[in-house]
Structure formats: C-alpha cells, structure tokens
Amino acid sequence: MFHIIDLALKWDERRVKIVDELKSKGINPYPHKYDITHTIIDIKKMERSDKPTDAFAFDISTAGRVANIRRHGKISFVDIFDEGERLQLQLRVNELGDRYDKFFEIVDRGDILGVKGDLLYTIKGELTLRIKDYVLLSKSLIEPPDWSKLSPEFRYAHRYVDFLYNDLARRNMEIRYSTIRRIREFLYSKGFMEVETPILQPVYGGALAKPFMSHVNYLNENWYLRISLELYLKRYIVGGFNKVFEIGKVFRNEDIDVTHNPEFTLLELYWAYADYNDIMRLTEEMLQDVVKNINNDSKIKYSIGGKEYTIEFSQFRKITMIDSLTEVLGKDVDKMSDEELKSLMDKNGLKPRGNMYIRGLMIEKLFDKLVTPTLIQPTFVLDYPVETTPLCKPHRSKQGLVERFELYVAGMELANAYTELNDPIIQDMLFKQEQEMFKRGDEEAHPYDVDFVRALSYGMPPTGGLGIGIDRLIMLLTNNMSIKEIIPYPMLSAKVIQED
C-alpha cells in the first residue's frame, strides 16, 4: 500500500510503513477495543512496602502510551503512561519468544499499547509489570516532540500534545473541573437549581459588549451568540423559579489578551427576595468554600509581574468605588468637576465610552485604570455610578448610584453583582437611553429587548444577581497570569492551529 504523505500533518514515513505492513498481514494497528483489568492508577495503588522481586499479582491487563524504550539484550524496559501516571514494563526473551524482537520493530514512543503480565519489583525496587503479551492499540504517526522546546503558541494550538507531555497543563485542567464541580455542589446545598438558557438569541444583552452574529437560514434572521446569561435567567425568576444558576459559555467579539478570551465560561445566579448585600455574603462564603476545598487552605500564592503575593480569602475588604478612587487620587472625587475628570482622563490616555464624557462613565474608566491594579487582596467595590449599567436597581439611599458591587482579586475583576432592576417603567427608559448612546457612537450600548421588558411587566420579585468569571478564578487557583493556560482550547488564529 502506498501513501502520499501530507507534509502539513508531519507523518513519519517509517511509522506509516509499519501501519501498512501490519494491515497487509491482517493485523489491525487500531483495534476496536481492549479489555483491561486495572488502570495504571489502580496498579500504583497495589504498591507494597516489602517490594518483592517475585511476582505477587498475576494476569494484570492494562494500557498506556509509550514514553520511552530501553533495549538491553534479552531483558528490556519500557515506560508507559496514562492519566498522568507511569508504569515500567519488563520484556524478556524467554517470555515473549519471537515477539520480543518484533516489539522493537513495530513499537515507538507515542504508541498506545495494551499489555498483560505479572506485577513485581525489580532489584532496584521499582514496581514493574513483566509482560507476557502485548497488543498495539494505536500507532502514533508523529514523533512526540521535546516538550521543553515547545513554544506557548504550539502548546495552545495543539493542546492534546500539551496535555500528554506537560503535567502542569494536565493539573490545570484537573483544578478547573474540580472547581466547577465544587461550585455546583455549593449552590445545590444552598437550594439553587441549575438551568439552561439559549446560546443563540434574537437580541443579545446582559452586558456591554460586542456580539458575534450568525444567520438562521430557516427564519432568514440574524441571531447572536449570547454575551451574558442574565436576561433569560431573570425570565426564570419571573416564571417562579426563585433560586437559579447556570455555568456556561458566553461570547464577546472583543480583545484577546492575558485576561480576555472571546469565548469564556461564566457563572450567573439569581436569587429572588434577596439584594446585593445577600449576594455579597453568598459570594464570600462560596469563594471561601471553593478555595479551601481546592487548595486545602484559605491562602493562595499568586504571581503578578514577577512578584509573588499571598492572597487571603478568609477576609474580604469592602469599599465604595468613589472612596477607592479618592484614596488613590488623594482628592475627593465627589468634589471634582466634570472638567477635572475629563482632564484626568486625557492625562491617563483614556478614551470615553462612545466618545461621550459622561461623569459616571469617566469615574468608572478612571477606577479601572488607577484603582484596579492596586486591589490585590479580595475587595468588594460597591455602589457604582448609575450610568454604568441599565440593569441595576437605583441605590436606596445614595442618589446617582446603583446597588452594584464588583469583586476584585489580584488586580482583576472576578465578580459582578446587582440588586436587580425589576421596575419595567425604569427599565424601558434606560434601554431607550442606551439606544440613544448607540446612535451617538457607543457600539457597546445595550440593545432594547422588548420581550425582557414585557417579562418584567408581569412582575419580577426583588432579586439579587451575581456573575463570576470562572476562567479568572481558575487563573488564581493555579497561579497562572495568562487565561490561555487554563482554558482547554483558547482562541487562536486558524492559521496557527492548522499549521504546525
């Protein structure tokens, strides 16, 4: 059999030839199934302190990927690995006969093997499976790379290779999904129900962001990938579900950098008859539970710009946005004129949203630039200017502000929460104001969602809501400064992914 080797795939010609020769002899190098009695993890649990050199467990069948091959005359050794664990195999001529030499003709690093044999310890005290039979389960056509020489771009583009040969990448994923599981368990314990909302939506909303657009051929309509989970979760609240949450993907057609990926994972929850104070307490309790469960400590280590910080989750600071900016500037922000704020914006190279110098939005921009990097320890920043969101309830005692908080850790926004706006008349007015902002050049202005206002018009109880960026939380728990390290398949140029 003759194959034209696709250079883009980088198949090894010798390996392809082995596959062809095996197939010509009726041997399938990619069989349908292999029965194992023990995983490598199971075998590692059978370790004994007395380390007998005679076999102590018999007819063990397992499988793994070949890490290295060490041929030594009539006795050779091979390491295989699976699920992050390694196992040494011992091959003997007197056990395998003619299949001993054949092994080295057809097996290479990277191949997946099924093996059967007896468990013992070598003279050096290493747990070893002395094999009596082996089966090639998947012939690798590409030589495994030298992981130490791989660029970050290669690792992100070919994540399957990264997971195989980079223990840290594998550990990051284990922490990621353990964290998500723990969040679910915590919310279940508090009586929340997990629900689903549409990913494709006729009107995007719930955040200030640019959407991805698609076209529904059957309807001949443009729809959007969701930028938030908020508006449909609130419809659940209107419908009588009092405690709901969703953990899902959202999509924002914006920047790609160390803390942003256009496709990311968000937790949102909504709690009827609660306000942002209740949500603040819930957030603190949940994060303390997650950090302690995942890290076995209330403290984590996190590096920023080469400096390592100890972040303590046992206590959370609280400060208003105005007070935090006043602290940094050394000047009372409430007493600053709009012209002073505009001058400060210009001095810091900040552009206003939609080219409009609106006081509340200038305060938010200055906060993001000047205060956010200083918030290393967990800090709830409270009471934002009313102009910053059209979906939050006005503050009950502070005119011009809304009952909103964001949680900052390690100089990053981690969570956003409101006492949710449930007055349909005010919601209608704010959506219309957003439309005026859009007409004046603000591309991130919130669109008018008629059905959402209609839902509020049926009556939504007082509600507290929360959003947490799961990816940034995982960055903290794994001490990673780049979001690409903790997203399994981060967004890259298609050219980078398709080309080696």
Curated annotation (Swiss-Prot):
**What GO terms are given for molecular function?**
ATP binding; lysine-tRNA ligase activity; magnesium ion binding; tRNA binding
Q: Does the keyword Ion transport apply?
A: no
Q: What's the superkingdom here?
A: Archaea
Task: Quote the record's binding site residues for Mg(2+) 1.
Answer: E406, E413
List of residues binding Mg(2+) 2: E413
**Top-level class of the enzyme under EC nomenclature:** ligase
Q: What is this protein called?
A: Lysine--tRNA ligase
| Source species | Sulfolobus acidocaldarius (strain ATCC 33909 / DSM 639 / JCM 8929 / NBRC 15157 / NCIMB 11770)
- Which cofactor(s) does the record list? Mg(2+)
Q: Name one GO biological process term.
A: lysyl-tRNA aminoacylation
